[in-house]
Swiss-Prot record:
Residue positions binding GTP: 437-444, 483-487, 537-540
Region listing for G3, in residue ranges: 483-486
SUPFAM superfamilies linked: Initiation factor IF2/eIF5b, domain 3 (SSF52156), P-loop containing nucleoside triphosphate hydrolases (SSF52540), Translation proteins (SSF50447)
Protein name: Translation initiation factor IF-2
Key words of the record: Cytoplasm, GTP-binding, Initiation factor, Nucleotide-binding, Protein biosynthesis
Subcellular location as annotated: Cytoplasm
Region of interest (G1), ranges: 437-444
Ranges where the record places region G5: 573-575
Biased composition (Polar residues): 49-69
UniProt domain tr-type G: residue ranges: 428-597
Region (G4): 537-540
InterPro entries in the record: EF-G-like_DII, IF2_II, IF2_N, P-loop_NTPase, Small_GTP-bd, T_Tr_GTP-bd_dom, TF_IF2_bacterial-like, TIF_IF2
Pfam annotation, one family: IF-2
Name of the gene this protein is made from: infB
Length: 927
């Protein structure tokens, strides 16, 4: 059974949807709104309920009532025609009676049919008469289509005109019976108006689509002409290229040229022959000028959804066009351009076939085929080695060369690359002077005199612990001085000082002469190729002998210019400032002869002089700028770390923003403290600096892991033997990185047989809680050099029983660690004979054992001594005494020529005349 919606039932019986919904709900039907559906029998019940709810009147009464209404209307009409005055007679209102809806619907339908027929004839006449001009035809069409227009005023005008015409001829047809006054909705009229509006809208859209199709056809024709012209031009160019390459033995190029010349026109023609389904289905040739179809399939355009779906339908699913858009003419196929092969090809190891094809502008399939002919099986995503790439390029006739890749993480390339500096921008720079010499020969005193400060008095034990970089000005020119330690432990720091210096001042005490560190400084300077200026210090002291110093230095290859050598000698007294001016003039003279120059326009490069950790500032590094200019906020890579220059201070502690060549500065902003002697370089941006720093740190870690010794069959015995060696674990914390290195190197050089030093951890900064935790876990001793533990670290060390040793002089640390190493060894014992006794008689006691009566013949016998039982010159037993008595008393010892009794633990086989030898094991102190 079919179903009906409530709004359709309301439309049929002339009721509102709300009334129908309420009536259906009162009948017990499960409906919610006017869109709810009911069965056909339920729909009949609803209609009958409306009919039965009102009192039915007889048919004749209805007819009589209709007759009265018609008659009254006729009378009123006649009165209106004959007399314009309003009637004074009161009109009686008809009593409300039951309505016959079926009769009313039939009457309305009949009236509408007659009206449509009459208006249709009138429309035909108007259309025939108004085809002479466009404007008049438009007006006639507007009048003829009045019944389709949703303009109720126009319908009323047509109705009034028809009424007047029929009134003149006295042939007015019977009108439908007058209905009682009320605002009823004329659904038929509204449906007719909606149909008219839809038809008009479709007509407008049809005309617009027709015009668009015509424009698209004209555009397609124009594009076809352009495509033909382009194809002819491409054929001519291909023919020229073919003639140009005819002399070259490249078969594949000929095939490609022929394909390119023959392909475009055929492809374009075949594609143009295709017609879309929408063009086939819509034949606009059958439409008239107004865009309305005269024949073919007439679809029911009254359904609004059908109209919308027809407008927005997409019949050709193969075309990726948007809905509602007509498919234009297909685009002509552009022909493939022919590209010349490059003359040179720069490749990198591991390039894929697809990358090579893109670079030389060839198809990957072509390269795969060539490789197959060469005996190499490859796909377009497969990597090729350098030899294969070169063979492939030879086959194409291209010169191939490998690309030189620059390692961005390599800082050393800036120092080795001569092209890094611009020769036109080289200017004179201040010399970098390093002061070297033996301990207490006056290096820091000389530097102190030069700077007019009292730094030297603050050195612990008279030893400079780390490099100091200072800059002074003499005769309008600047000189940079580096002060290096003289102790033997600081060999690496002296070597670093020689590597970054331009001139070496070798200071030798006139009363002390050449010492081991003096010779070492000479060797460092010669290895670096640095000129040496000898300053003979302490000439004011009694016993000073400069001539002896000159002769001793000549034995080591440092010859004075007075003796025909190359080294300048100046006799000074650093304490009293004697001949200091002459020494500075000599430095400037040697610097002028060396022609020291630098390029201040490049990005800065240089060397780390010293590095430390500051509690408030973090990592602080003392840098010596060798080339370029260092600015604040420059991204920088220092050793295996990176950062941005947050702040710069000079040797006087003042903030500076720019540091030129040969300028020492201290910077902050690094993520961790670098190693002294590391090189640094400024990068273009922070991203590049970060990448280079992280890569260098990764390489350093990998190198450290590679240096780890692994156990193998060859070194298995050595490893087991090394496990027997005892070790002293130490944790080193110092104020500067150079002191950390020197202290660690010195401790590792301590030679105590059977014991070695194991540096568990070494760093710059104060002793903190993590150091104490590490020392507890590794059973290590913490050595603090010029640093103090934090209060929290000290409390934790006391609680965990961790030993912290604090020092300020390096040789004190070495002595203390050496003592600890000696105490770590197992003690050595030496046997000491106390005395001898002879067994005179034996006594066997049950449940006790054998008691030997003895007499001491030499030395003494003690209670805690060990004894040997010797019989006939052979040791029978070696053990401990269980008891020792003199007569009946227990005694600790029995002296010479005395008698006593003894028992030996776990031994009862004593016999007369056995010799008892008493001895102890005495510890020997290591030297």
């Amino acid at each position: 059974m079919s179903k009906k919606r409530l709004h359709e039932i309301a439309k049929e019986i002339g009721k509102t949807s709300k009334e129908v919904v309420e009536q259906a709900q009162s009948l017990g039907l499960p409906v919610k709104s006017h869109a709810s559906s009911v069965e056909e029998n339920d729909a009949t019940r609803i209609v009958e309920s409306f009919s039965s709810s009102k009192t039915k009147a007889p048919t004749n009464s209805v007819q009589t009532n209709q007759g009265v209404k018609t008659e009254s209307k006729t009378v009123e009409t006649k009165q209106g025609l004959s007399d314009d005055k309003p009637s004074t007679q009161p009109v009686a209102k008809p009593k409300p009676q039951s309505r016959n809806f079926k009769a009313e619907r039939e009457a309305r339908a009949k009236a509408e049919a007659e009206k449509r027929q009459h208006n249709g004839d009138h429309r035909k006449n108007n259309r025939h008469n108004d085809t002479r001009s466009d404007d008049r035809r438009h007006q006639g069409q507007k009048r003829s289509n009045g019944n389709r227009n949703d303009n109720r005023q126009g319908q009323q005008n047509n109705r009034n005109k028809n009424d007047g015409r029929y009134a003149d001829h006295k042939q007015k047809p019977q009108t439908r019976p007058q209905q009682p006054a009320g605002n009823r909705i004329d659904f038929k009229a509204r449906a007719a108006a909606l149909k008219a509006e839809q038809n008009a809208e479709y007509s407008r859209h049809s005309e617009q689509r027709f015009r668009e199709e015509q424009e698209a056809k004209r555009q397609a024709a124009k594009e076809q002409e352009l495509a033909k012209a382009a194809a002819l031009k491409a054929q001519e160019e291909a023919q020229k290229a073919k003639e140009k390459l005819a002399s070259k033995p490249v078969a594949k190029v000929k095939e490609i040229v022929n394909k390119v010349a023959a392909t475009p026109s055929q492809t374009a023609d075949s594609r143009r022959k295709k017609q879309t389904r929408s063009d086939k289905s819509r034949q606009f040739s059958n439409e008239n000028e107004d865009g309305q179809k005269q024949t073919k399939n007439k679809k029911n355009w009254n359904n609004q959804n059908q109209v919308r779906n027809q407008r927005n339908s997409n019949w050709n699913h193969n075309k990726k066009n948007k809905k509602g858009k007509t498919n234009g003419a297909p685009k002509p196929v552009t022909e493939r351009k022919f590209h010349e092969l490059p003359k040179e090809f720069e490749y990198t190891e591991g390039m894929t076939v697809a990358e090579i094809a893109k670079r030389i502008k060839r198809e990957p399939a072509e390269i795969v085929k060539k490789l197959f002919m060469m005996g190499v099986m490859a796909t377009q995503n497969q990597s090729l080695d350098g030899d294969t790439i070169e063979l492939l390029m030879v086959d194409y006739g291209i010169e191939a060369h490998a690309k030189v890749e620059v390692d961005e993480a390599d800082i050393e390339r800036f120092f080795a690359d001569e092209d890094y500096l611009n020769p036109d921008n080289l200017t004179e720079r201040p010399p970098v002077v390093t002061i070297m010499g033996h301990v207490d020969h006056g290096k820091t005193t000389l530097l102190d005199t030069l700077r007019n400060s009292r730094v030297a008095t603050g050195e612990a034990g008279g030893i400079t612990q780390h490099i100091g970089a200072y800059q002074i000005e003499e005769a309008g020119k600047k000189i940079t001085f580096l002060d290096t330690p003289g102790h033997a432990a600081f060999t690496s720091m002296r070597a670093r000082g020689a590597s970054v210096t331009d001139i070496t001042i070798l200071i030798v005490a006139a009363d002390d002469g050449v010492m081991p560190q003096t010779v070492e400084a000479i060797n460092h300077s010669k290895a670096a190729g640095v000129p040496i200026i000898v300053a003979i210090n302490k000439i004011d002291k009694p016993g000073a002998n400069p001539e002896r110093v000159i002769s001793e230095l000549a034995e080591h290859g440092v010859i004075s210019t007075a003796w025909g050598g190359e080294s300048e000698f100046v006799e000074i007294s650093a304490k009293f400032g004697k001949n200091i001016q002459e020494l500075l003039e000599t430095v400037l003279l040697v610097a002028e002869m060396e022609e020291l120059k630098a390029d201040a326009d490049v990005r800065a490069i240089g060397t780390v002089i010293e590095a430390r950790l500051d509690k408030g500032k973090g990592a602080v590094a003392t840098l010596l700028v060798q080339q370029g200019t260092l600015n604040v906020q420059d991204p920088i890579v220092v050793g295996n770390t990176f950062g941005r220059v947050r702040a710069m201070t000079n040797d006087l502690g003042r903030r500076v923003k720019v540091a030129g060549p040969s300028t020492p500065v201290s910077i902050t902003g690094l993520n961790e403290a670098p190693m002294a002697g590391d090189h640094f370089a400024v990068y273009a941006d922070e991203k590049a600096a970060r990448a280079a720093g992280e890569e260098r740190a990764k390489r350093a870690l990998l190198k450290q892991r590679q240096n780890t010794q692994r156990v193998s069959l060859e070194n298995l015995f050595d490893t087991l033997k090394a496990g027997e060696v005892k070790s002293v674990n130490v944790i080193i914390k110092a104020d500067v990185q150079g002191s950390v290195e020197a202290l660690a190197a010195s401790l590792l050089k301590i030679d105590v047989e059977g014991v070695k030093v194991n540096v568990v951890h070494s760093a710059v900064g104060a002793i903190n809680e993590s150091d104490v935790t590490l020392a507890e876990a590794s059973n290590a001793v913490i050595i603090g050099f010029n640093v103090r533990p934090t209060p929290q670290a000290r409390q934790q060390a006391d609680a965990d029983d961790v030993e912290i040793r604090q020092h300020s002089i390096i040789y004190k640390v070495i002595e203390e660690v050496e003592e600890a190493m000696k105490g770590k060894l197992d003690p050595e014992y030496q046997e000491k004979i106390l005395g001898e006794a002879i067994i005179r008689e034996t006594f066997k006691v049950s449940k006790v054992g054998t008691i030997g009566g003895f007499m001491v013949i030499n030395g003494k016998v003690t209670r805690d001594s060990s004894v040997r039982v010797i019989r006939d010159g052979v040791v029978i037993f070696d053990g401990k005494l269980a008891s020792l008595k003199h007569y009946k008393d227990d005694v600790k010892e029995v002296g010479n020529a005395q008698e006593g009794g003894l028992m030996i633990e776990n031994y009862n086989d004593l016999k007369e005349d056995d010799t008892i030898e008493a001895y102890i094991m005495e510890e020997i102190k290591r030297k």
